[in-house]
């Protein structure tokens, strides 16, 4: 029996050693290609269909974080250099707030437990711009908070593009970076409105979707 177990482990180890490099060699270039394609596509959409682009982009941000799709910084930095402002980076802020609201609403429907405590703490951390613990720990396993966060983000993204909210510097998409939205006009006050829309939308949608734990 021990020989059989040892043989099975040996086969699995060999399979892993063969398949892992093949997977990484295929997945890494594919992920890079997908990221470049999405970046170019959204850059075009934001130029030609602002509110729709805002809704779509902000709505899928949780998925891009979960799957590790990156590459937006190049467009954001180019916008800041050429235009003096950027409209893509703020969407990550709105999405973070929507995730916060969705996860905290889910926590309110749960009985006291370690998972509920984790949801509250990670939901609050989202406001600072760190969503991975909330996404991987609560939203993705529970599904409904993820859907609510995506819906809330979409609403906020469309609202922001309709109001023309932009950032004037590259920064962490969290509450500590709100000074980068200050200008001589009312951009900052529009930001506050979109922030409220993002958090409240994520919270309300999640609260309605999730049943109270008995």
What are these regions (language model features)?
Residues 3-10:
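Short, small-residue-biased leader/transition segments that mark boundaries at the very start
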Residues 57-70, 83, 106, 125-128, ...:
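Transmembrane alpha-helix interface/packing and boundary motifs in multi-pass membrane proteins
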Residues 26-31, 49, 64-72, 94-97, ...:
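Short helix-coil transition sites and intra-membrane helix breaks within transmembrane domains
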Residues 15-25, 58-63, 98, 102-105, ...:
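Hydrophobic core segments of alpha-helical transmembrane domains in multi-pass membrane transport
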Residues 7, 30, 34-49, 59-63, ...:
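Hydrophobic alpha-helical segments of integral membrane proteins
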């Amino acid at each position: 029996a021990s020989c059989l177990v040892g043989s099975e482990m040996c086969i699995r180890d060999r399979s892993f050693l063969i398949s892992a490099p093949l997977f990484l060699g295929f997945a890494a270039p594919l992920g890079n290609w997908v990221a470049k394609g999405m970046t170019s596509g959204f850059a075009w959409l934001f130029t030609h269909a602002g509110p729709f682009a805002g809704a779509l982009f902000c709505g899928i941000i949780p998925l891009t974080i979960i799957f590790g799709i990156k590459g937006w910084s190049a467009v954001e930095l180019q916008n800041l250099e050429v235009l003096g402002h950027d409209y893509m980076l703020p969407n990550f802020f709105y999405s973070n707030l929507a995730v916060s609201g969705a996860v905290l609403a889910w926590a309110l429907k749960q009985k006291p437990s370690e998972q509920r405590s984790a949801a509250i703490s990670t939901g609050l951390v989202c406001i600072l711009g760190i969503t991975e613990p909330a996404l991987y720990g609560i939203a993705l396993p529970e599904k409904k908070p993820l859907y609510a966060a995506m819906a809330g983000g979409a609403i906020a993204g469309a609202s922001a593009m309709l109001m023309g909210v932009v950032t004037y510097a590259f920064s962490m998409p969290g509450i500590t970076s709100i000074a980068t939205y200050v200008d001589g006009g009312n951009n900052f006050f529009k930001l506050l409105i979109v922030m409220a829309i993002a958090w409240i939308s994520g919270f309300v949608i999640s609260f309605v979707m999730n049943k109270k734990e008995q």
